[in-house]
Amino acid sequence: MAERFPAYTFHPPALFVASFVTHLESALDGTHLPARTLQTTHKDRPLWVRYDLGAIGDALTKDQLLGRPPTMWRYRELLPPEPGASIVTLGEGMSPVLPCKRLGAQVGLNDLWIKDEAQLPTGTFKSRGLAMALTMAKELGVDRVAIPTAGNAGGATAAYAARAGLEAYVFMPEDAPPVNKYEAALAGAHVFLVNGLITDCGRIVQEGKERMGWFEVSTLKEPYRIEGKKTMGLELAEQFDWDLPDVILYPTGGGTGLIGMWKGFNELAELGWVDADALPRMVAVQSTGCCPIVRAFEAGARFAKPFEDPETIASGIRVPSALGDFMILSALRESGGRAVAVDEGHIRNWMQRAASTEGVSVGPEAAVCVGAAERGADEGWIGPDDRVVIYNCGAAQKYPDVMAHELPRIDKDAPIDWDRIAAGG
């Protein structure tokens, strides 16, 4: 790929000059709701943001994007902020998409790529959704937010709340990765550890709404995180010169990114910017330790049953019950994709394989996608020449306990054993 985004000095994006949002829409039953009031869910299920795509097509061409800064806000016509909105940003967006020839050769794929979201401001893809959610929350008059999180969303919420000047409350399982706990507290959030799962944290946030007066920004409990996450797909299309890959492997917990990308691809198709008959096959990847979406997909169900006793070192996909389960399953089926569960016991190996062959700091969530790539090639549902993109949702450095290795030591006073060094330890 040509270098399309040279180095630049970051400036906050210009104030939005137009908004093409028409309404919000229930993902469950299609009910329309007004867009410019504070909304959460409809019948306890998520909302879509809908746009006047015809007007966007008249106002924007692909070529106009070329002169804009390489952040997710370059797609402002396809995003919800109103004219005059103050954007809450740390420069998020345009993460690199990296060719992985050696890793691809190992798993049997000739055209494997990793889109490395670990390079975003908070070290994870959560930067996108929380930048958008906090922008819209502030625009709509919120001054206090709360979130239940398995880890990474807590740090991102804290960072963007600090950037926005909002008060943040973060609730996470007590066994969440230590880095996630400390980064959220460092950014000034009120952090509480719960001796349970993310669902238990969610119950606390729900019960505290009236007493504490906070607005919940958890996965799919408000409509705007999807819009931030969909920019992963808009970027990918632009980075591949509007020729989308054949397969996207996505580590799936709450599924906001998968849902958002599929929405974005369909919006691009309606604009005529990508081929509507060549959209990617979306693959939701989970661990055998927590795979409610896989079970529902295989059963042909619209909704997933809660997964009992989930256990996985990939904390970001330890989600036993996803609010948007039916939206995930719909995207998989519409795209001709699938849901797969890979062996929990191999996650560390897949992390190391990606890092040692390509130098990419792959977290345990993305590591499951390395396993899925190999399985897809072996089983034939990914062709050897298919263009395949793995989303690396967060840096391995977020998980020091998962990365831990027993390293060989050298006694400074002993003779140096060069044979041992040559053998690698």
Q: Which residues are covered by each model-predicted region?
A:
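PLP-dependent amino-acid enzyme catalytic core
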Residues: 5-425
